[in-house]
Amino acid sequence: FACGKGGNAVHFIMEHEQMSYPEALKYLAKKYGIEIKERELSSEEKIAQSERESLFIVNNFARDYFQNILKNHVDGQSIGMAYFRSRGFRDDIIEKFQLGYCTESHDALAQEALKKGYKKDYLVKTGLCYETDDHRLRDRFWGRVIFPVHTLSGKVVAFGGRVLAGATKGVKVKYVNSPESEIYHKSNELYGIYFAKQAIVKQDRCFLVEGYTDVISMHQSGIENVVASSGTALTPGQIRMIHRFTNNMTVLYDGDAAGIKSIRGIDTVSYTH
């Protein structure tokens, strides 16, 4: 690869699309019109593939649920949409990034998912819900506006949720993100990469910003070759993903202590990779 890491196209797809080896082969074969002869999957491979697909299906349900709440629920309009409007986001941008809202009810998503037949186990494994000590299911993102995180191919792999000042009492953590899972490895994902990849190639440059709203604001301003590391120091995996499309990166972090520390971290990672 241009970033200097060894490997082949299959391994690259496996790493950055979070696919198994058979899934990556099928993806590339379909993309380039190559016919492949398939062998019968082992029982273990079938189970693993089925589980990964199930986790993505549950994430798709959650994305649609959060979007529907934002558009049609009274709290979605008065709290969630009001926040996005305060940031100046247009309807087309809200739709493009599939933004949503989760009500302050602690188990509304969980109850709706169970009612529609989604398994409790998958709700927990995706990180959408967690189980309390008394075995009740609770929504991880209650009372927050929702930012879906997409893979390079556009699959919803995780979510970020921001609490709104004054809207949810007693909550001190501003952002909550999906935990690591079978399909989500934070160090290999960049927020906005699915929407930015074509512009990055066209402009031969990637702008790196800190957060979800930074990416969305720049898209709305017509600058689409932008991604975010979503509050973490840039990792080798994220550097490799950017280098897949360009060797030119401009960092637009805040000038505070945290931003300066992150920039120094980028220097170290870039030098070693």
Question: Language-model segments: which ranges?
Answer:
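Phosphate-handling DNA/RNA-contact segment within nucleic-acid enzymes
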Residues: 47-57, 61-62, 103-249, 262-263
